Amino acid sequence: MKSICAAKGEICIIEKEIPKIKDNFILVKTSYTAISPGTEITMLKNSKEEYVSLGYSASGEAVEVGSGVEHIKPGDRVACYGAPYVSHSEYLLVPKTLCVIIPQNVSSMEASLVGLGAIAIHALRQAHLQFGEIAVVSGLGIFGQLIGQIANASALKVIPFNNTEKRAELFEKITGVKTFVEEEKMEEYLDLISRGKGADGVFLCAGRSAGYQTNKSMEWLRHRGKSIIVGDIEPHYDRNLMFDKEIQIMISKAGGPGRYDKIYELQAIDYPYGYVRWTEGRNMEEFIRLLDENRINVKDYMKEPIKITDVESALVELQLGNQEELTKIISYL
């Protein structure tokens, strides 16, 4: 099978053996994988001599299931998430805890965003906001867009902000939510709807160059508000500002509890439902449910899928910052 890797700063397409089925795992014939621009461009830049697999979010068809898998059968369409089990490869061997059924109403292309969706959902959960509270979403790349949409679907008062017009216009077109390009106008609107109190939470979804926003977020927040780091931002929080407002600083790690835990992933042992309500697997299911019920829309984030041979040029385009495209979908059909 073909698999996309990075080595010495270059994209490589290599041949690998199709994985053999094992207990508690599902062998998936890949239909689509979604590129996560920030993560994969960074991995490409940092790659050394050894091949590093790229990708972590996919959809496909279950072709074989191991002993212990009860919720999926061969022939089912599935969405799956999480490196090293999920990558830009023609076949994937995925633990049952990281594989969910795709309902009839959801396309396989949409479902290939499941990993990015789980990350967005976990970021929102980290903030522990309640409906009616005010959430500023700064940075409308793919994660900011998804967080803003899901927050809006959860009846939060969302104030989206991005300093480039195309991404702001895209979010406003999809959601109908007033979106801001100018920081000053966003601050005026925040002051208006919060009656001068500030936001309950600020989601920082921009890239490393937007580190200044960590301090800015504290100005936007109410007393004891929450600043949540989602993007690859280098934090620069001023202690006096933190102290003055008793700001809560949070960071969101991937798709939720279970990520990078060998017991949950490699051994495919789920956490007890009553103690860990929202694992990464259950966040995946929730993202698919939101798609199924048309509570969020990801169709406008995707253009025609690309071929596996076009990945290098696609990453170059994304790295150059094409503001109209937030991701690329690779087709294996």
Say what each PLM segment does.
Residues G82-P95:
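A structural motif shared across PLP-dependent enzymes of the aminotransferase-like
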Residues G196, E285-P305, E312-L333:
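C-terminal capping/lid region of NAD(P)-dependent oxidoreductase domains
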Residues P19-A34, M43-P84:
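Glycine-rich beta-strand-centered segment in the early N-terminal region that forms part
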Residues K178-S252, G258:
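Glycine-rich cofactor phosphate-binding loops and adjacent beta1-alpha1 units
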Residues R239-Y301:
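C-terminal substrate-binding/catalytic core of Rossmann-like NAD(P)-dependent dehydrogenases/reductases
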Residues M109-E184:
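Mid-domain Rossmann-like dinucleotide-binding core that forms the NAD(H)/NADP(H) cofactor-binding site
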Residues F25, Y32, S57-S59, D76-R77, ...:
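Residue-level marker of beta-strand positions
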